[in-house]
């Protein structure tokens, strides 16, 4: 374990006890820089259980930070693992699914599946965007996920058949 990883590991209990949404960004930077598996697992576990006020807003902002690109899949997975309400941000997840990697697309699909409520107008716009993106995507795996996300949203509007 590097000295930096040991320092991060030592600071985690204090963040866990007294942390608020402002702790999220430093945790993400620590995760991006951590090389030790134990440190990475501990930070990821803390993120997946985050319940602090404004956590969703802080995580959404972190998606646009270039230095945090290596941990974007973890950021995306945090939304659904922590059960954060992101109903007003469907466009962010659809945009990330379309522009991102296949792994990011998978995490966005999981967020969409796990969020119980999405605004109807956002759903309708997203269905069109996903349909167009799937037609233009070269990666067949990602195409399948984009179409699956489209299907999930269509089902929310009562347009598609239920899938299992």
Where are these regions (language model features)?
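Short inter-helical turns and helix N-cap capping residues of alpha-solenoid HEAT/ARM repeat scaffolds
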Residues: 3-4, 35-36, 67-68, 100-101, ...
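Structural detector for internal amphipathic alpha-helices that build alpha-solenoid repeat scaffolds
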Residues: 6-19, 29-30, 38-52, 61, ...
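Buried hydrophobic core positions in alpha-solenoid tandem helical repeats
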Residues: 26-28, 58-62, 90-95, 123-131
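TPR/TPR-like (Sel1-like) alpha-helical repeat modules
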Residues: 95-101, 113-134
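Eukaryotic intrinsically disordered, low-complexity regulatory tails and linkers enriched
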Residues: 161-164
């Amino acid at each position: 374990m590097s000295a930096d990883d040991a320092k991060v590991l030592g600071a985690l209990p204090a963040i866990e006890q007294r942390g608020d949404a402002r702790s999220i960004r430093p945790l993400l930077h620590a995760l991006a820089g951590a090389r030790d598996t134990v440190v990475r697992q501990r930070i990821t576990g803390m993120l997946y259980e985050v319940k602090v006020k404004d956590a969703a807003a802080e995580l959404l902002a972190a998606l646009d930070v270039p230095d945090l690109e290596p941990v974007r899949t973890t950021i995306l997975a945090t939304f659904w693992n922590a059960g954060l309400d992101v109903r007003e941000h469907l466009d962010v997840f659809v945009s990330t699914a379309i522009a991102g990697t296949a792994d990011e697309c998978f995490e966005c699909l999981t967020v969409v599946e796990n969020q119980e409520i999405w605004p109807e107008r956002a759903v309708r716009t997203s269905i069109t965007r996903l349909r167009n993106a799937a037609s233009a995507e070269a990666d067949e795996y990602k195409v399948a996920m984009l179409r699956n996300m489209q299907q999930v949203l269509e089902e929310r509007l009562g347009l598609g058949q239920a899938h299992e």
